Amino acid sequence: MSKKTDRVIMNDDIRVPEVRCNVDGAESLGIVSTDEAMERANELGLDLVLIAPDAKPPVAKIMDYGKYRYQEERKLKEQKKNQVKIDVKEIKLSVKIAENDINYKVKHAREFLAEGKHVKFRVFLKGREMANPESAKDVLLRVWAMIEDVGVMDKEPKFEGRYYNMYVLPQK
């Protein structure tokens, strides 16, 4: 597996004879020799950065690379901060669960949904319970009847391996 390299080609590392050159926030110099573009960058006290090395001719920009890199890092940090992380809470049930236990687990599920978290209900089938998986579906449907006013069923009760699963999302 190859990693993408973020190596930036700039200043003396640019090995092409001519580039299409732009000055950061100003005019375009057009197609000039790499040496001429480097001289112009040195006059301005900035860096010559190769932006599009695959273009014909390659595109270079005269800019303050340190400032540019700092702004890019801040943008990435801001995007990461604004990402929404979905919290999925799992509630385990059994086929032989008592009514009081269901009420207790439903109370917790309601709290999770009120906080905006997703809830995954799982009924584990043991031993002979595997012979009648519909009983697990009945338990999930009983739970659904208790929480349908605060949640939206994302996935219907579904049999997966030894579990019957149901996903519930908070109402909007």
Swiss-Prot record:
Q: Ligase: is it a keyword of this entry? A: no
Q: Which UniProt keyword terms apply here?
A: Cytoplasm, Initiation factor, Protein biosynthesis
Any Pfam family: IF3_N
What InterPro entries does UniProt report for this protein, alphabetically?
T_IF-3_C_sf (IPR036788), T_IF-3_N_sf (IPR036787), Translation_initiation_fac3_CS (IPR019813), Translation_initiation_fac_3 (IPR001288), Translation_initiation_fac_3_C (IPR019815), Translation_initiation_fac_3_N (IPR019814)
Q: Where in the cell is it found?
A: Cytoplasm
Q: Name one GO cellular component term.
A: membrane
Molecular function terms, GO-annotated:
ribosome binding; translation initiation factor activity
The primary location reported for this protein is cytoplasm
Disulfide bridge map: none
Any one Gene Ontology BP term = ribosome disassembly
* Primary role: IF-3 binds to the 30S ribosomal subunit and shifts the equilibrium between 70S ribosomes and their 50S and 30S subunits in favor of the free subunits, thus enhancing the availability of 30S subunits on which protein synthesis initiation begins.
Oligomeric form and interacting partners? Monomer.
Q: Which family does it belong to?
A: Belongs to the IF-3 family.
Name-wise, this protein is Translation initiation factor IF-3
Organism placement in taxonomy: Bacteria, Pseudomonadati, Campylobacterota, Epsilonproteobacteria, Campylobacterales
